[in-house]
Structure formats: structure tokens, C-alpha cells
Amino acid sequence: MALQFIFGNPGSGKSHYLYEHIIRESMKHPDINYIILVPEQFTMQTQKELVLRHPRHGIMNIDVLSFARLAFRVLEETGNGSREILDDEGKNLILRRLAGKKEDSLKVLKGNIKKPGYISEVKSVISELTQYNISPDGMDDMITEADESSYLAWKLKDIQVMYQAFEEYLADKYITKEEILDILCNVMDKSRMLKDSVIALDGFTGFTPLQNKVLGEMLHHCQKVMITVTMDKREDPYVMKDKYQLFALSKQMVTSLVKIAGEEKVLVEEPVCLYQEPVWRFRNAPALAFLEKELFRYSGRTYREKQSNVRVYAAANPRMEVECAAQRIRFLIRKKEYRYREIAVIASDMNLYADEIEKTFREYEIPVFMDYKRNVLLSISGVFLRWQNRIFLQKVCSVS
């Protein structure tokens, strides 16, 4: 039972080192389970990378999972997966029903609860409270700190009423996605999949209290836990001065895990440090390597060599900004032999740029995947269905 960190700058090869290490060890020890935990959205890409890297192009004793998928696997293995899992729509329906029953007990939310989207916001607050292991009773301290006569305190009291009613309604019937990790902690000692396995975590910048609780149980039951951490060699990863310093999230993650390891009496092994200069990702782009090294450092240093890695364009409006980006992408594809999958467009406000990007890229015949949530009510099909229902209801009313 041990904990090991892999430190390195962005682009230094932390994931590469971790994946290669896991592949080598999995081939040496085919009887040991190796589990790589990544954020939910990266599971498929990580599986693909491992299969391509593996000499045999197969990962029989390596599983790539997120925290939620790991919980499902363990609950299924231990026979604790019989309770139905409630999704977000189910939560909204239950909360709307409970809001009607508790309407007389609500002081602040009473006048807003029927507004479109308000129940969804209440659901999000309750979900976050669950993720951070705060019970309805635990909200008493929050209310006291907020000054019991303040507007915030009254709103928190209403949330507490809804939260308490929600918990009572779910008892022994359903479990939420946020509660799965708490249940996982209670059954982890029964899992043969996790016993003496090697856990590797990649792509995280921090953990919720429930995830930290899961990691504590892993340190107790698993052979080893490895985790990649973005860190600069000029920083001490084990010293957290304040939450506004550079790499504060990484330091908070490291210090909390070291504390958990100490509580579980688990050895913290010597870390792997990947601090070579320039970092691997920018080995052929010295200007970007300099930018990575000096950004937010306020050292006063400037890059004086000629470079073409960083370009700044000024445009009169978002439409012209997007058109400039489209022209540059077309140039890279036609002249520099780039591939579309190698190009990303990052926008500060998708509500402002999304329509312009879709329209302009369609004109330039550039395929694009928009990574943002669309409002279904504003889609063409959504508007069509709503107006169709409205016309039908008007006809029914006129006939009756």
C-alpha cells in the first residue's frame, strides 16, 4: 500500500510516463488488476491511447474508468446495485412535487419555485451539497454563519427544507449519482476487483470530499495509488500558502492526499519528477515553451527572438473574429497539411460565438463539433412542437 505522485509541467509527458509504466507492469504481472481513473469525458480517448500504445494492442488487465463507472462496477460485483439510480430529470420531477407539498414552509423560494428552470437550480445546489458530503443537518452551521436574519440565511433554510424532504423521499427507494461514491466506500472491502490492484489517476486538478474519501479507502485496500499532478519545479508541491497562488489547486490536492495517506498509515513514495526543459510538448516551439515558463510569473522577462508560434489579430466584431479563424484553419489544412482533428477553437463565451462559428464554418466547409449544451426549447424542432401544441389547444378551446 503506497501513494506516489508524478510531477511535471503541462506538456512534460506525465500521462505518457504513466501509461507506459502501467502497460509494462500489466504485462509483467497479468494477475494484477490495473485501473486508470480519468474524468468521465476522457475515458474513451484514454482507452484508445492505451490500445494503440500497447505492444499487443489489447488491455486485458487494464480498466479505464471514471469514479462513477468504477462505483457501478464495484456495486454490481458486490451485489449492491439493486437500488434504482435517479437521473437529473427524475430529481427535477421529485423536487417539483415536494415543492408543492412544502410550499407553505418556504419563505423565499415560494414565489420563485414555479419559474422555468428554478427547480433545476435547486437540484444543482442539492447535488453539490451531496458531493461535498454536507447533510441537511450540516447546513445549520452555514445558516448560522450567514446571519440568521439575512436573506441568504432564509434562502438556505428553504434549501434545507427541500433537501430534507428530498432525502426522506429517496430513503430505500433510489440513490442519486452523487451518493454512489459514498456507498462505494462502504463496500470497497468486499471487492475482489480492487483488492491488491494498482490505481492510476490522470487528468484531475482536484477532488471533492467524497472522492477523497474513496481515495482513502483505495489507499487502504489497493496495492498502490499513482497520480499525475501539474507542477512547476520552482514550486514546493507539499506547501500550500494560499488559495490564490500559482498551482494552488495542485498543491491543495497533494497536501490533502498526503494527509489522507498519513491517516491511513500509508507510505508516500519518492515522486517521479518530469521537469526537463524545454517541456516535450513545446520542444519545437521555443516561443510557446517560454510562454509556458513565464506566464503569470511577472518576472519581467521578454522573448526577443523572431517567432511565428503566437499571433495576435484584432477584429471589429465576433463575426470577423470567427471569419479570421476560419481563414487561418483553411490555410493550415491546405498549405501546412494539418488535419481537422489537430485544431481546436477556444471561445470566451459560447453564447456569443456559437452561432457565428457554426454559420461561418459551414460557409468555409469546415467540419466542427460544438462542445456546449444547447437549449432544446430554442431548437427548430422544439419551436415547431410547441407551436403545434399551441395551435391544437386553441382549436380544442374554440370547439368546446
Functional labels for PLM-detected ranges:
Residues 21, 50, 211-217, 356-360:
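A short acidic, amphipathic alpha-helical/loop segment
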Residues 2-6, 14-17, 101-203, 210, ...:
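Accessory N-terminal region flanking or inserted into the helicase ATPase core
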Residues 206-279:
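Extended, H/D-rich, highly charged conserved domains that either
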Residues 79-99, 293-295, 385-400:
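A polyampholytic, Gly/Pro-enriched intrinsically disordered region
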Residues 1-4, 10-26, 32, 40, ...:
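Helicase P-loop NTPase motor core
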Residues 203-205, 350:
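Conserved Walker B
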